């Protein structure tokens, strides 16, 4: 697994785009040390929202 891109939203929220050994992309949505994985960007963003992230109030870093 390698990290292709990371977006930090502040307050411990982050979204990583990852690539596995087969070259497939997937996503890791995290709040601090708690992370969930998804094959789809939309689902990963939904995971962030489920962890309490509000896209209307995020600070893009």
Predicted features along the sequence, with ranges:
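Alpha-helix N-cap recognition
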Residues: 40-41
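Short N-terminal "domain-start" leader segments
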Residues: 1-28, 35-36, 58-60
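Short arginine-rich
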Residues: 50-59
């Amino acid at each position: 697994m390698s990290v292709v891109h990371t977006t930090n939203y502040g307050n411990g929220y982050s979204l990583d785009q990852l690539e596995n050994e087969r070259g497939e992309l997937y996503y890791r949505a995290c709040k601090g040390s708690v992370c969930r994985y998804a094959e789809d960007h939309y689902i990963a963003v939904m995971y962030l929202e489920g962890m309490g992230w509000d896209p209307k109030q995020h600070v893009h870093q």
